[in-house]
A protein has these predicted regions:
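Hydrophobic alpha-helical membrane segments
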Residues: 1-243
Length: 243
């Protein structure tokens, strides 16, 4: 597993300018919920949406604004994820990145958008149904845990395998189950990175300002690295790239 981290760090540093350029899409995707008057809250450098408890009380205009904002946020998020995965594919398979960008970017982005949209809809439905039924909170997290394997590596499969949405979801669950250790490693690195930087920003400036600075930092530096790591892990399914 150590070489996965090594490949990720090397790819991140050697393509830092390109990564930072594409990370602007992550930043836009994260900022849209804030400026669209979402019922949101921030924690550990992330934006979280209060869905069921708030959406049921919205009027038509507010609801329409939120739906449109989610749509555009997912578009920017999809573009950024695809771009980072293209960098990984270029680094490890020596595919010409310009050809990939011009010929596959729109197709990949639309498929990844479909994956993210489906995941978002399912999360919202779970939240809404559990809120209405007054079910215990742990059931929501259990449902999220059950569907996550179908979505975790799906964006990587879309770009690396040129998969369609359903096939990408099948490949995602297949690889996650086969290499569950990679999934645990990714979670551990994400948790440690977010915790460390969150703590540092609180120490530097223990105010609401540090929360928004952390959001920007995560979007520009941390999130691209985690997507790159995820993509590098998925590439391990190819025997010729296991070294």
């Amino acid at each position: 597993m150590a070489n996965v981290i090594e490949y990720t760090v090397n790819a991140y540093l050697s393509n830092i300018r390109t990564v930072l350029l594409f990370s602007l899409s992550f930043l836009v995707a994260i900022l849209i919920p804030i400026f669209a008057a979402f019922p949101t809250y921030s924690d550990m450098g992330g934006i979280f949406v209060r869905t069921a408890s708030e959406l049921l009380n919205l009027n038509v205009v507010s609801f329409s604004i939120i739906i449109a904002s989610i749509f555009f946020s997912l578009v920017f998020l999809s573009f950024a994820i695809v771009a980072i995965n293209i960098i990984t594919k270029h680094e490890r398979t020596h595919v010409r990145i310009k050809k990939e960008v011009f010929e596959g970017l729109e197709r990949y982005t639309s498929r990844v958008f479909a994956v993210l949209l489906l995941f978002t809809v399912l999360l919202s439905l779970f939240d809404l149904l559990l809120y209405v039924s007054h079910a215990p909170t742990f059931i929501y997290y259990l449902l999220v845990l059950l569907i996550t394997p179908f979505f975790f590596y799906a964006p990587s499969s879309v770009v690396i395998d040129d998969s369609r949405v359903l096939h990408a979801m099948r490949m995602s669950v297949k690889f996650l189950v086969k290499r569950f250790d990679y999934f645990l490693l990714w979670l551990a690195i994400a948790a440690v990175a977010l915790s460390i930087f969150d703590g540092l920003f609180i120490l530097i400036s223990p105010t609401i300002v540090s929360t928004y600075i952390m959001l920007v930092f995560n979007a520009v530096f941390v999130l691209p690295f985690l997507v790159l790591l995820q993509s590098q892990m998925y590439l391990k399914r190819f025997a010729m790239l296991k070294r």
